[in-house]
Structures are given as structure tokens and as C-alpha cells.
A protein has these predicted regions:
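A residue-level marker of the well-folded mature domains of exported/periplasmic proteins
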Residues: 1-305
Length: 305
């Protein structure tokens, strides 16, 4: 039996964060499990109106993001106790029907850091991100810690561009970091890979497979991938059988439940030492089994040179 699901996105569905939600919901729709409708480019000022309209239309599950409107979104959930809400949100679950998620892909970020720490020759690594908020900060810290675990002499340059999508600004920030001496970059935002290609240095990708999807061939060594399928499928199943409750879905976006992985090395397969690939493979198994825990640090990371 199909359930009706609405996706409400603040960005275009091509934007990588919302794209991961849309892909997972679209896959469920193609399997015939849900009837899926969505709205994109919904501003925070208009979000509650759109949310209420969907709730009044017979939707059974809403998937979206409440980062700028946490309190208001919870009020809507209170007004529609029969509807399930799965929202990107930095706070705790609410009531009986408001579950929260975020992208906890810090584990593959740590693994990328190990590779980066072995590949830098200058011992200077650059990172360009959107905003210094938890979901970005934790990824940067994990990447830094992974690099430092194999090379404690590395210094970092950190820049936030104040936008989720401004490729020219991200490229400019990356160019400035390369001028400052970095020879490896973490491309948290689109635009960084372009700078790395022009400057002849390598990069590591974020959320989506930037080697294949952002013209990163020969530049992007690997990417920390975020998969929302496990979380979305769990929410759909719970909604269908009437057991949906207010939960934290963080674990569903981590490696053990298939919510995060490391992308293939592609043409870098032969450029990464076998010993490093072996170390990453061994540590991946330990993370999956719970024998190794990657620290979560949501504090703003700072440049160290």
C-alpha cells in the first residue's frame, strides 16, 4: 500500500544536500512504495505555509529541513499529530511525530583525512566550506583528525564562504589557499574542484561523488558520500505500519547502517600506496563493527597557519 509523502526543499533539488533526500524519495516512488510530491526553492519565510498546505492535503509523511524554523516546524507537527515528520534539524526530536536527521558522514571524512595526510607533500591542507555550523564543522574536524593521525606535522587553512551555493566564491577562496601553499583540499562546496584543477592539485569531495558528478576526474581522489536511502526507507516503513515516533536518525546516516560510504578511488587507485589503502580498509571494518569511533566535534575549526 502506497503512502503519500511530500518533500519540501529550501534549495533546488540539484543542490547536493537536498539532492540526496530527493534521490532517496524518488527511488522509493519508482519502487511503487510511495506517492511522492515535492516543492523546491522554498524560502524559510514561506516554508511554514507550504508545510501546512501539504499537511492539509492528506500527506502522511513529510521530509524536509527545519534548520532556520525549528520552533515553527514543531508547532505544525503539534497541529497535525497524525502526520509523520522527518526533518533536517540540529535539535532534539519533538512530541510523538517529529523526527530529526543530519548528515553524519564524519566517518568517511576521517578515512579521507588519512589518505590526504599521506598524499600532501607541503604538509599544508586547505578546506573551504559553506557555514561554520555543526554539520560542516564535524566533517572538517574528522578530516583534520584523520590527517593528523598519520602526519602530525600538517597545518590547515580553513575558509567559510557564507553560502551553500556560490561556486565562484568557493573557487576564489580555494585559489587564495593554494597561493598560501596548500597542495591538498577538502572541497566541501562546489567551485573548489575547479580551482584545484587549474592549480594542478588534488581534492577530496563531500556528500556526492565529486569525481564523477562535478567534473573531478584526475582531481578528486575520493569523496565522503551521504546516502539517505536507509533513513528514508526506515521512516516509510514506520509510517506504513503505524509505528512512526519521534527519533534521532543520526545513526541512519552513518557507515554501519549504510548512510555513509567512501567513494571509489577511480584513476587514483594506483596512486595511493597499498599500505594506505589497506589501513583505510581495515579502519572501515573497525568503524562498521563499532571497534573504532570517530569523534564528533561540532565546534568551529580554525586555521593553524
Amino acid at each position: 500500500q502506497k503512502i503519500k509523502v511530500a518533500g519540501i526543499y529550501t534549495q533546488p533539488i540539484q543542490q547536493k544536500w537536498d539532492a540526496r533526500l530527493h534521490l532517496a524519495l524518488d527511488a522509493a516512488a519508482k519502487r511503487g512504495e510511495i506517492e511522492y510530491v515535492f516543492s523546491e526553492k522554498v524560502s524559510n519565510t514561506d516554508y511554514v505555509r507550504v508545510l501546512r498546505e501539504y499537511c492539509a492535503s492528506g500527506i502522511q509523511l513529510v521530509v524536509g529541513e527545519a534548520f532556520g524554523i525549528s520552533k515553527e516546524a514543531r508547532k505544525v507537527a503539534d497541529d497535525y499529530p497524525e502526520i509523520a515528520f522527518l526533518m533536517g534539524d540540529p535539535f532534539k526530536p519533538h512530541g510523538n511525530n517529529f523526527s530529526v536527521f543530519d548528515n553524519y558522514i564524519h566517518e568517511p571524512c576521517y578515512l579521507m583525512g588519512i589518505i590526504a595526510g599521506n598524499m600532501t607533500k607541503a604538509n599544508k591542507i586547505g578546506m573551504v566550506g559553506g557555514y561554520p555550523i555543526g554539520e560542516v564543522n564535524r566533517l572538517f574536524h574528522a578530516f583534520m583528525n584523520g590527517a593528523l593521525s598519520v602526519n602530525d606535522g600538517i597545518k590547515f587553512k580553513v575558509t567559510f564562504i557564507g553560502s551553500w551555493y556560490d561556486p565562484p566564491k568557493a573557487k576564489e577562496a580555494a585559489m587564495a589557499q593554494v597561493e598560501a601553499g596548500v597542495d591538498v583540499m577538502y572541497a566541501e562546496r562546489a567551485g573548489v574542484v575547479d580551482a584545484c584543477r587549474e592549480k594542478g592539485i588534488i581534492a577530496f569531495g563531500n556528500v556526492n561523488d565529486m569525481n564523477k558528478e562535478e567534473d573531478g576526474t584526475g582531481v578528486v581522489v575520493t569523496s565522503a558520500l551521504w546516502h539517505m536511502e536507509s533513513a528514508i526507507d526506515h521512516a516509510i516503513e514506520r509510517t506504513k505500519n503505524g509505528t512512526f515516533s519521534a527519533e534521532e536518525y543520526h545513526n541512519w546516516t552513518m557507515m554501519a547502517k549504510g548512510g555513509a560510504t567512501l567513494a571509489p578511488y577511480y584513476e587514483f587507485e594506483g596512486k595511493i600506496p597499498d599500505s594506505v589503502k589497506g589501513q583505510v580498509a581495515d579502519l572501515s571494518k573497525k568503524i562498521m563493527s563499532g571497534k573504532f569511533v570517530v569523534e564528533i566535534n561540532d565546534n568551529e575549526p580554525k586555521s593553524t597557519f
